[in-house]
Amino acid sequence: MRWPAMMRLTCIGILAQFALLLLAFGVLTYCFLISDFSVIYVAQHSYSLLSWELKLAAVWGGHEGSLLLWVLLLSAWSALFAWHYRQQTDPLFPLTLAVLSLMLAALLLFVVLWSDPFVRIFPPAIEGRDLNPMLQHPGLIFHPPLLYLGYGGLMVAASVALASLLRGEFDGACARICWRWALPGWSALTAGIILGSWWAYCELGWGGWWFWDPVENASLLPWLSATALLHSLSLTRQREIFRHWSLLLAIVTLMLSLLGTLIVRSGIQVSVHAFALDNVRAVPLFSLFALISLASLALYGWRARDGGAVVRFSGLSREMLILATLLLFCAVLLIVLVGTLYPMIYGLLGWGRLSVGAPYFNRATLPFGLLMLVVIVLATFVSGKRVQLPALVAHAGVLLFAAGIVVSSVSRQEISLNLQPGQQVTLAGYTFRFERLDLQAKGNYTSEKAIVALFDHQQRIGELMPERRFYEARRQQMMEPSIRWNGIHDWYAVMGEKTGADRYAFRLYVQSGVRWIWGGGLLMIAGALLSGWRGRKRDE
C-alpha cells in the first residue's frame, strides 16, 4: 500500500470537507445577521432587534446550529492535523485521518437527516421568536465553541490512539503525538467549563457556580477522563509504560465526548442547557454513540498487545503517584457518571422520575478530592528539584481552585427580604440600600432596574443594579442579578417580584473566594499551555 499517496489524497479530501463546512456555517451565520426568517432555525432562535453579538451566539443557541458548529470544529481539527503532517509517510497519519473521517461522516449524516439547520418556510415568519433569554449573555458567545473545540481536540487524540491500534503498536512516539493534540483540547474544554460556570453564576441568580446539572456533568465527564489521560501519557511518551491506561483513557474520553452530546441534544434529560425539544433524535444519537463506542472498544480488544515488561514502583515514586492520580480520577468519574445517568435510566425504564442532586455529588466526591490534594502535595515534595514549572503552575491552580471552594462555602451569607426605595439592610457587615427603581427599554426587552447602594462602615463603595427584564417576543420575564467584586469579596443582588406598593423581593449574598475558583482554572490552563510549548521546543 502506498501510504504517501494515500496521505496526499486524504489531505485533499479533509481540507475540501473543511472548506465546504465553513461555507455552510458562514451561510447560516449570514442568515442570522440579516434576520432571514424564511429559515425555520433562524425564526426560532433570533429576533430582528438582537445585537450582532447575540445574533452570532444564536447561531449555536439551538440544537441544529450547535451540532453544525461541532462538526465544523472537528473538521477544523482534522484539517489542521492533515496540514501539519502532510509530508509524513508513517501509516499512523492517514489512518488517524481515516478514523476522523468516519466519525465526521457519521455526524454529518445525523445533521443532514435529523438536524438540518437550513429548512425553510414560505411565507417567511414576520418576526423571530428571539434567542432564549437565559442564553443572552456574553459568556454564551464563547462557551459552546470552546466546549466543542475541546471535544474536537480530544477526539483527534483518541483517533491517534485508535489509528495506532490499527497500525499495530502504541509506542512512545504515538503517545507524544496523542499528548500533543490532547493538551490543547483539554485546555479549550477547561476554558469552556470555566466560562459556563461563570455564566451560571452571573445569570441564574442563585449565587452558586456549579449546580451538578446533567449537562454540566456532561462536560465534566470527558474533562475528568482527559485529565487522567494527560497524566498517563506523560509516562507513556517518556518511558513507554501505562500504555493500556493511555489507550483506554483515550477511548473513554472519546465515548464521554459523544455521551455529552447524547445527554444535551436528545431531550432525555431536562436542563437549562438542553436544547432538544423532543426525543425524536434520541434513537439516532444513541445509535451513533453506541456504534462508535463499541467499535472503539472492539478494536482495543482485538489489537491491543501486552503492555510489555512489568513495571515495579518503589515507595512514593513519580509512577506510583501518577497511578494513584489515575485511580482517583477514575473513582470521581464513576461517581459523576452514575449520578448523571441513573435518573435517566430510571425514567426510561418507566419507574418514575428521580433526581440526584448536589448533596450526593458533594458527599461522594469530597474524600477523593481531598486525596487528590494530598497526592499533589506529595508529588511536589517527592519531585524536589526535578519538579517542572508547568506542573507546578497547574497544580498551584488546583490548590487555588480548592481554596476558592472552601472559602466561598464557609464565607457565604445570604438574606431574602422585601424592600422599598429608601430602606436598607445590613449583611456580613455591609449595608445594602435600595435607592430607586429605573425603567428602561433596550432592544428586545424592557426592564425595571433597581439601584442598590453598597456601604462598608458608612462609606459608599459602589452600586448594584439588579433587573427584572421582560422579553416581548417570548412573553418571558427574567431576573438579571447584579454583582460587584474585588479580588476577595463578591456582593450579589437579585430583584424578584413586586410584593406591594413600591416593594420588591430581594435576595442578597456576600461571599469570598469565588473568583479564586476561576483563577485556579486559568492557572491550570496556563500550566498546560506552558507544558505544550516546552514539549514542542524539546521535539524541535
Language model: regions and residue ranges:
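Solvent-exposed, non-transmembrane regions of integral membrane proteins
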Residues: M1-E540
